[in-house]
């Protein structure tokens, strides 16, 4: 191993979180003192700092990391990770996802949903037509939008369908037990 890579000691290797959820990503080094630039995937960008512990995967090994400091520089956050003391070590962490266990998420009301819970759900219309699976969700200023990968043999001959996440108007029912979302939507729209 090179001296300038982030090192993994045998005693640092740990059991990964039982229910891992990616909440951000290290996108590169910042400066020469081991700071890293991060991208937050949380609804409010600074919510990423309300969790602990954090995990990353380095060289196919789970590693718990500790954030000693963080700062907002422009519109991006920089973070000082304990044990990362130079630019090369920081750069070796580029593209590592920042992971927590989902048990750290706050409890939510019955009519609220985490995006992670909707990904993979099957989408059907109120007429009972199977559209496909939710593969991602796009956040917009007006409303969120479900990206549905359509079934291969769909009648509409389209690959993906965008469905506005409008409860009651378009989204008629969400059942996380059966992993189904019922919509009143015409994919040709």
From Swiss-Prot:
Species: Blochmanniella pennsylvanica (strain BPEN)
Protein origin, superkingdom: Bacteria
GN (gene name): rimM
Lineage, uppermost ranks: Bacteria, Pseudomonadati, Pseudomonadota, Gammaproteobacteria, Enterobacterales
Record has Oxidoreductase as a keyword: no
Localization, UniProt: Cytoplasm
Pfam families in UniProt: PRC_RimM, RimM
Protein's name according to its UniProt entry: Ribosome maturation factor RimM
Description of how the protein assembles with itself and partners: Binds ribosomal protein uS19.
Domain remark from Swiss-Prot or TrEMBL: The PRC barrel domain binds ribosomal protein uS19.
GO biological process, any: rRNA processing
Family statement drawn from the similarity comment of this UniProt entry: Belongs to the RimM family.
Keyword Chaperone attributed: yes
Main location: cytoplasm
Molecular-function annotations in GO: ribosome binding
Boundaries of every PRC barrel domain copy: 110-189
């Amino acid at each position: 191993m090179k001296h300038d890579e982030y090192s993994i000691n045998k005693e640092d290797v740990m059991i990964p979180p039982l229910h891992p959820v990616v909440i951000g990503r290290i996108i590169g080094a910042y400066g020469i003192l081991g700071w890293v630039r991060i991208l937050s995937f949380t609804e409010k960008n600074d919510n990423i700092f309300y969790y602990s512990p954090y995990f990353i995967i380095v060289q196919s090994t789970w590693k718990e990391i500790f954030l000693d400091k963080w700062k907002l520089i422009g519109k991006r956050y920089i973070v000082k990770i304990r044990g990362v003391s130079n630019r090369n070590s920081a750069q070796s962490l580029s593209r590592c996802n920042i992971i927590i266990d989902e048990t750290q998420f706050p409890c939510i009301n019955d009519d609220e949903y985490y995006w992670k819970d909707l990904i993979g759900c099957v989408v059907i219309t109120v007429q009972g037509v199977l559209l496909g699976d939710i593969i991602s969700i796009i956040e917009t200023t007006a409303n969120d939008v479900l990206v549905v990968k359509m079934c291969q043999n769909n009648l509409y001959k389209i690959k993906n369908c965008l469905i506005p996440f409008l409860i009651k108007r378009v989204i008629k029912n969400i059942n996380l037990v059966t992993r189904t979302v019922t919509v009143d939507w015409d994919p040709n729209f």
